[in-house]
Amino acid sequence: MPFYEHVFIARQDLSQAQVDALAETVTGVIGEYKGQVHKTETWGLKQLAYKIQKNRKGHYVMLSAEVSGEAIAEIERQAAINEDIIRWMTIKVDELEKGPSVMMRKQERRGGRGGRDRDGEE
């Protein structure tokens, strides 16, 4: 089966538990189609570059999976129906990335908050 990375942005007013439930819904669809989720990352609440459906921020979630094209079509159909998901993107990749994604490495390097240390150094 081919490899896919699916990223979605959830509304800013959702709790973390609700965002996790959305990720579980996607994982459930992948399981129904005999696929396998290799990695799920929650990137947190981030500022959007522009307003999307009156939201200035959004909860970002990325899933890396090995799944069929029919499952991806169903995931995208459900994302279009769900009002809690404001944007999504699915890409087909040659192989899945080992370890944390670039976004997670950036958060770890910044100490999770993205600000400066008390000494004024980054």
From Swiss-Prot:
Q: Which GO terms describe its molecular function?
A: small ribosomal subunit rRNA binding; structural constituent of ribosome
Which residue spans adopt a coiled-coil conformation according to this UniProt entry? none
List UniProt keywords, sorted A-Z: Ribonucleoprotein, Ribosomal protein, RNA-binding, rRNA-binding
Cellular compartments per GO CC: cytosolic small ribosomal subunit
Q: Where is the signal peptide?
A: none
Q: Which GO terms describe its biological process?
A: translation
Taxonomically, the superkingdom here is Bacteria
| Entries under SUPFAM superfamilies matching the protein | Ribosomal protein S6
- Which Gene3D superfamilies would you find in this protein's record? 3.30.70.60
Fetch the PANTHER family from UniProt.
Answer: MITOCHONDRIAL 28S RIBOSOMAL PROTEIN S6 (PTHR21011), SMALL RIBOSOMAL SUBUNIT PROTEIN BS6M (PTHR21011:SF1)
Task: Identify its protein family.
Answer: Belongs to the bacterial ribosomal protein bS6 family.
Free-text function comment from the UniProt entry: Binds together with bS18 to 16S ribosomal RNA.
The protein's name in its UniProt record: Small ribosomal subunit protein bS6
State the gene name recorded for this protein.
rpsF
